[in-house]
Amino acid sequence: MNSIVYTTKTQHAVMGLRASLALLFVCGVVYTGTVTQLGGALFPAQAKGSVIHRDNVAMGSEFIAQPFVNPAYFYSRPSAVDYDPMATGGSNLAPSNPALRERVMATSQEIQARESVQAADIPVDLLATSGAGLDPHISPAAAKLQVARVAQARQLAEPQVLTLVAQFIEPPQWGIFGQARVNVLKLNLALDQIAKHAQ
């Protein structure tokens, strides 16, 4: 009797192991491989991370923010993860948290000094991190706030830089989701193209 029970348990264990291995193969190999191949065939740029290249050099992904510290470039919004794509996330600090207030105040003072503006003129997206910490966009207002600095650093006329900003304003997704926005990397690369053609 005991041997029959033992045999039945062993059979069930073997069946469970076979089912697990089959599902692992189907979900981990067949499904993943199929989706990867389809993605590469139908959406080759997106499947490879939407990386923007200039002169065969990868400049970054259009969907991942990166820090810009040169005054000749538009700056991205703050990142709670120091722009690390492997550690996406917000700061999780509550609005009542003193650490959040201190960080926002420090960022505000830095922007006021850098852009020669008042605190009330600073758009909120230049003070607040995004949910993922890697939002590659800023608002049109945040871009326009930086125009004077960028124009001066590049020795360009402000109207020329404003026109460039206007060209890179993206509408809300499908016209209804989100707000108008400017991709910082694309805008900065366009600035570099202007400088390249001016030489």
Swiss-Prot record:
InterPro entries: KdpC (IPR003820). Keywords: ATP-binding, Cell inner membrane, Cell membrane, Ion transport, Membrane, Nucleotide-binding, Potassium, Potassium transport, Transmembrane, Transmembrane helix, Transport. GO terms for molecular function: ATP binding; P-type potassium transmembrane transporter activity. The keyword Coiled coil does not apply. Its main location: membrane. It is found in: Cell inner membrane. Pfam families: KdpC (PF02669). The chain crosses the membrane at residues 21-43. It is a single-pass membrane protein. GO terms for cellular component: plasma membrane. Part of the high-affinity ATP-driven potassium transport (or Kdp) system, which catalyzes the hydrolysis of ATP coupled with the electrogenic transport of potassium into the cytoplasm. This subunit acts as a catalytic chaperone that increases the ATP-binding affinity of the ATP-hydrolyzing subunit KdpB by the formation of a transient KdpB/KdpC/ATP ternary complex. NCBIfam families: kdpC, PRK00315.1. Belongs to the KdpC family. The system is composed of three essential subunits: KdpA, KdpB and KdpC. This is Potassium-transporting ATPase KdpC subunit.
